[in-house]
């Protein structure tokens, strides 16, 4: 099932036109700029549970990460079904060359500077992975019991789902929108 939660009647109509379920208009208190995602998902779960259906898990697709290749969602569902984890998060690989700033103004490398590998030598274990907000799959009980999309509590399990680097855009600034638009145009023109 594809369910859209929105407070906008026009967006609801568009979602329905493309085959999504829009069983309710999201309440105003869950549609503010400061509203977290988890209460919105919990609202939808509660709606469906009260109406006789409780999903085993929820796949969250956020509009700010619109680039997904054909087959990605089916591959994600398959991996989640096979792995037995409580939650799964979409990630893209990034090199290990990450730096942080300390309060004293000094930078610190999150890698061994004197043993810096070439990018071509990196392995699955030496890459870092960036959560990009594109896709999460979470067992329903994690939302309802822990109010989180990831099972980071003691005993909870999380899996990583590798997205193609082209799927890694997260729209936070105007330039990100341009990048996403370009990537989607490219994907559609190539027929991927």
In which residue ranges do the predicted regions lie?
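Short beta-strand scaffold positions
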Residues: 4-6, 137, 171
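A short acidic, often aromatic-flanked loop/helix-cap motif at beta-alpha or helix-coil junctions
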Residues: 29-33, 96-97, 166-169
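Short phosphate-binding loop-to-helix
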Residues: 3, 9-59, 67-71, 75
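Short active-site oxyanion
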Residues: 1-3, 166-167
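Conserved core of the sugar-phosphate nucleotidyltransferase
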Residues: 37-39, 43, 57, 65-154, ...
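Catalytic donor-sugar/metal-binding loop of nucleotide-sugar-dependent glycosyltransferases
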Residues: 148-169, 174-178, 183-189
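Short internal beta-strands
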Residues: 2-6, 90-91
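A generic structural signal for short hydrophobic patches within well-formed alpha-helices
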Residues: 12, 142-144, 177
């Amino acid at each position: 099932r594809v369910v859209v939660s929105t407070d906008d009647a026009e967006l609801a109509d568009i979602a329905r036109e493309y085959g999504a379920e829009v069983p309710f208009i999201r309440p105003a208190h869950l549609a503010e700029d400061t509203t977290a995602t988890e209460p919105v998902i919990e609202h939808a779960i509660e709606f469906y549970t009260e109406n006789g259906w409780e999903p085993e898990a929820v796949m969250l697709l956020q509009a700010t990460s619109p680039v997904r290749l054909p087959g990605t969602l089916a591959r994600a569902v398959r991996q989640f079904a096979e792995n037995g984890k409580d939650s799964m998060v979409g990630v893209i690989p990034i090199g290990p060359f990450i730096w942080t700033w300390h309060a004293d103004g000094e930078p610190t490398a999150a890698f061994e500077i004197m043993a810096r590998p070439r990018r071509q030598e990196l392995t699955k274990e030496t890459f870092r992975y960036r959560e990009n907000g594109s896709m999460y799959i979470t067992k329903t009980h994690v939302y309802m019991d822990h109010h989180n999309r990831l099972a980071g509590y003691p005993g909870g399990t999380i899996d990583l789902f590798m997205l193609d680097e082209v799927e890694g855009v997260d729209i936070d600034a105007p330039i990100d929108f341009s990048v996403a638009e370009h990537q989607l145009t490219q994907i559609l023109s190539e027929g991927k």
